[in-house]
Amino acid sequence: MSADFLSQDEVDALLKGVSGEADEPEPVGEAADGPRSYDLGTQERIVRGRMPTLELVNERFARYLRIGLFNYMHRSAENSVGSIRVQKYSEFARNLVVPTNLILVAAKPLRGTALFVFDPSLVFLVVDNMFGGDGRFHTRVEGRDFTATEQRIIQGLLGVVFTEYARSWKPVYDLSFEYIRSEMNSQFANIATPSEIVVSTTFALEFGGSNADMHICFPYSMIEPIRDMLDAGF
């Protein structure tokens, strides 16, 4: 008959189960076939290594652009190249002024869309110089779109940039840059998701004592197929 009765330990175990105090087995790790978390910071750390070939391309472009702008504007322009920045696209877009001329660009044969950004101060500075000014008088930027005349000059400037940038890339990789469309707001120029890693460079231009910036931005996924070339140097 004693086998029909529960021991004190068994009674205690049942009471814990009813009250919700029963010990639960500790997880032994995620199942091999279950979903795995992905740390976006991991990609960022991988990308952050130096890309010496891209640095040389940028330096070469800065030299070529100076000559190209002189031929286009018949004015001397000084320019300098900033360091390559690796960051999330949301961080890059957050630092852009509004309105800004955002130019979506195909870089064939690479897959994806690059972004060339002309700060409004650059556009107005070039327009002023094209019409005989010296860039000392600043046009109000906020609250208006670019005029038809300004858009034509932007296209001319973009042609110079495309020509000289392709020339700078040619010893490394033969790229052809093609205009897709322009936007004024970064919300409509999403070349990448907000959390996706992008690689960008800022070029500072100076006309007669006035400064303006131009930015070139690639999604990392776009240049990843040629990453070995960018690491190697030439």
Region annotations inferred by a language model:
Residues M1-F234:
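N-terminal auxiliary interaction/assembly segments of multi-subunit proteins
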